Amino acid sequence: MNRLLARGAIALLLLLPTAALADPALWVVKDADTTIYLFGTVHLMPKDADWHYPMLNRALADSQTLYVELTDDNPANIAGLVLRLGMDTAHPLTSQLSESEAQRLRLLANKAGVPGGIQTLNIMRPWLAALTLSLAPLKNAGMDPEQGVDKQLKGQMTAQHKPVIGLETAEQQIRLLADMPRAVELGLLRSSMRDADKGTIKLGQMIAAWQAGDPDAIDRVGIAEMRAQEPKLYQVMLVQRNQAWAAKIASLLQQPGTIFIAVGAAHLAGPDSVQVQLRKIGIDAVRE
C-alpha cells in the first residue's frame, strides 16, 4: 500500500481536497494493437472531491483491465501485516531517540491526535511511527483512504465486471519500509518529526500541482527533497519500483487490448518517473 509511503504521507500520497474542474495528468503508451493509459492517483481524499473529467472517463470506458498498486489492502490483511512487521515492544521508540527528540515526539503525538499518544508510538518501529505521525492529522482533517482515487477506480471497474490486478502485494509494499536498515528507519522518523510543522503549507502546494496536472511541480514540491536528503529511501520507494513497473508495461505491450494503470502520482513525476524508465527501454509515454 502506497499509503505506507513515507516522507510522511504528505510527500508521496499527494492528497486531494475538495476541488472543482481538476484535470490530473493522463499519459498513454501505444503500439499497433495495445493501448495503456497511465494515471497518477491520490490515496486519501474527502468525500465530496470530484476528479473525473471527459478524457479520463473515455479512457476508463475503453479499458478492459485496471492495474493498481495492490488489491489485497483489506483492513484485516493490513492489520495483520502491521502487527507482524511494524511493532517492536522490546525496543521502546523513545529509547532510540535523544531526550530532546523523545520530547518532541510526545508533543507531536498529542498535536497530531494520535490515539493513545506517545504510548501508542512507543511500541512501534520507527517507520510505522513516522507514517502514523503523518497520517493522523490528515485523517482528522477529513481525508479518507476509502475515498482515495485508487479505491474509487477499483470499485468502478469491479462494478463493470472488469478485472482489477495488483502490481504489488500489501506485504511487498510494507516490506519496502520494514526491511530498511534501522538507521534509515530512524532517519525517516526524524524527517517526519522535523517536517511536521510544514505539512499544511506543503500539502497545499502539492494539491495545486496535482489538480493542475503539473508533474514538474509535483516533483519540486513533493519529491526533490527526498531525492536530496533521503537518497536510499528515494531509490527503494520510487526508482526501483518505477523500473519494475516500466518492465511490466513493456510486457503488457506484447498483448493486444486496452489497459488502465493507476499508481501514486509521485511515480509519474520527476527525473526517475515511470515515463523516464519507459523511455530508457525505447517506449514513449505521451501526455494526453
Feature locations, PLM:
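Hydrophobic alpha-helical transmembrane segments of integral membrane proteins
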Residues: 13-14
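Structured, acidic catalytic/metal-binding patches in enzyme active sites
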Residues: 23-233, 237
